Each structure stands twice: as C-alpha cells, then as structure tokens.
C-alpha cells in the first residue's frame, strides 16, 4: 500500500496552495489566492452541479427562437458556470473583502486573466507537490 501513496493526489488538492497574484502590468502585487486542485472535493461537487445546471440551460435555450440570441444565452450561462467551478477552487485570499461565493464570482468576472490563471493552475497536479510552474504565465509563482 505504501507504494501506492506516491500516486495519491486528493489530500494535496484539498489542502491547496497559495498563489501570488500579479497585476495586469506584470508587477507583483501583495495579494494571493489559495487554490484547491481538480482532485479536490470542492471541484468535484462544483463540476457535478455544473453538469446538472447545463442540462437545464440547454432546455431553456431551446425555447429561444433566435439562433444568435440562443447562442449568446448559452455562452453566457457556460461562462457563469465555468467561473462558479473556478470560484469553488478558491478557498481563501488576501483581500480585505470577505472570500464569499458572490465576491469570488465578481472578481473572476471582472478579472478574466485571473480566471485563466486559476483554471491553468488547478489542473496541473504537479504544482500541488511543489513541482515547478508548468502551465503558469511566467509572471506567476507558487508559494
């Protein structure tokens, strides 16, 4: 069994890692996000909720006759749910604003570059084991 432990990722994904944030200019800020990985319970629950919601969204979209309006509606809902999944993987942050679901969603919507970083980081299991920075922008580093 001990040999199998080398492959276990869930505990590290649930523990999370602090990732420093950089401003859009590339300058380092004093802020950070604590991110959970794709193997975390939070990610699993959020993606299950998203899959269920997307079924309802497709049914609702079917009622929209205009093809372009239907596309815009579905695209908006997909983006909203993507951010919900990403926000579930933010367990803490350094901002004075409380780290609530609503605040995380507002932040990700207003700062899509941060949403991209979160999406890239949480999917790279190596980063939860302190193994490099593959997939991160060069201005990002892992604590």
Can you annotate each of these PLM segments?
Residues 53-93:
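Negatively charged, Asp/Glu-rich surface segments that serve as flexible interaction/assembly modules
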Residues 46-48, 79-81, 101, 122-123:
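Short alpha-helical segments used as structural interaction elements across diverse proteins
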Residues 92-143:
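C-terminal charged interaction modules
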Residues 21-24, 64-68, 100:
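A generic structural signal for ordered alpha-helices
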Residues 32, 66-73, 103-107:
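Charged, low-complexity surface segments at secondary-structure and domain boundaries
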Residues 1-61, 129-143:
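Short, charged/polar N-terminal "headpieces" of proteins
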